[in-house]
């Protein structure tokens, strides 16, 4: 028997068996152990979930704002009480270090839920006077049933980022986690039910994008899809949403983000920022600053500092709390990252450190790749153009500000960007010219609940977090009231 046993679907407030017979395994990427057997949902299960969500949403939306807020706040309390248990499950499922999952994944997800629980009472309409005898008022009403489709890198955090604003606005959600990391989304469903969420308001359907995702994005009973994943899949989701019932969509589709270090920067700080922007979570972060631009005159000095920082990486068993660098999420993904590394070598980039799988001793059974830094990179290289989603930094040199801005923007992506400088005027001047939705000055990576996040260009549509996201889970109804006479032209 695997550690976590058989995992069912979660529909209408309870675990239920799939109507089909297909299952798939959850694998611990640190050692290759099968930790759970997970049932795959079918199109019939999607129908069941939509029916349950439709009924549950009516109950949920009829509650007062304060009633909904209290239930979501209870869920926040339970998440925090169970933080260590959920963090260990996330570590087993994703390979992320326990030092990370205990302090980031559940913590930041709970913060977002608490933020939206507090915003529920502010979902207000407007009153617009027209004349003495007539006025208009507006109502913000929920969309109904919405779907969330998650990525594998931040399973429970993404489930919370998507469900928190949706539920706060009075909607019901059907959530499909990535088939690579499905386990904590199911636990979140349990927690919502324990907190008092009506049956059917949050459902979890496990399975592949081609089956479950396809059925969700084309289902006529779903009003909106929020998706996190790759560009190709995002285009499919958007086409399905438009081709079925003109569903609203929110998408976060990844990036190849630039980090620009200017000649006045504190290079020790710049190196620390570059390390966080490339090797946190073993490089599996959508916003990673993998294109690191350094003035040509500072290249050698910066490389020395990066090499010193790499020595502080502590790879190993992710359940060891002294470890800060774990395996990649899966063995197939490790092979994908290694192919990118080999392409970098073939195209002439110089390996400063790493560039190989980690296969000795304790690493032999896991999906480990050594932290890798390429230098002498060119803009046309595959490792510079494509999202690798692994621990691979590319160092590029530049001569002047105009050049680096142009090259930083020369990408189909536009998710994030950052600069390191002591010059406040330059900081704002450059940031305002960078084509990215999330920008950092002298820092990297923080995405607090209050901050809207999302991309330009092919990196996404819409935003997550912040007040604006809550508004996009509602629709505005306008009502005109006439207190005086009505005169017909007929």
UniProtKB/Swiss-Prot annotation:
- Claim: NADP is one of the keywords in the record: yes
Q: Name one Pfam family in it.
A: Aldedh
Active site located where? 162 (charge relay system), 252 (proton acceptor), 286 (nucleophile), 464 (charge relay system)
What is a single molecular function from GO for this protein? betaine-aldehyde dehydrogenase (NAD+) activity
What superkingdom heads the lineage?
Bacteria
Report the cofactors: K(+)
Q: Which residues bind K(+) 1?
A: 93, 180
Q: Which residues bind K(+) 2?
A: 246, 457, 460
Gene3D superfamilies xrefs? Aldehyde Dehydrogenase, Chain A, domain 1, Aldehyde Dehydrogenase, Chain A, domain 2
Q: Which residues carry this modification: Cysteine sulfenic acid (-SOH)?
A: 286
Oligomeric state and interaction partners are given as:
Dimer of dimers.
Q: What does this protein do?
A: Involved in the biosynthesis of the osmoprotectant glycine betaine. Catalyzes the irreversible oxidation of betaine aldehyde to the corresponding acid.
Q: Under what name is this protein listed? A: Betaine aldehyde dehydrogenase
Q: Which organism is it from?
A: Pectobacterium atrosepticum (strain SCRI 1043 / ATCC BAA-672) (Erwinia carotovora subsp. atroseptica)
Gene this chain is encoded by: betB
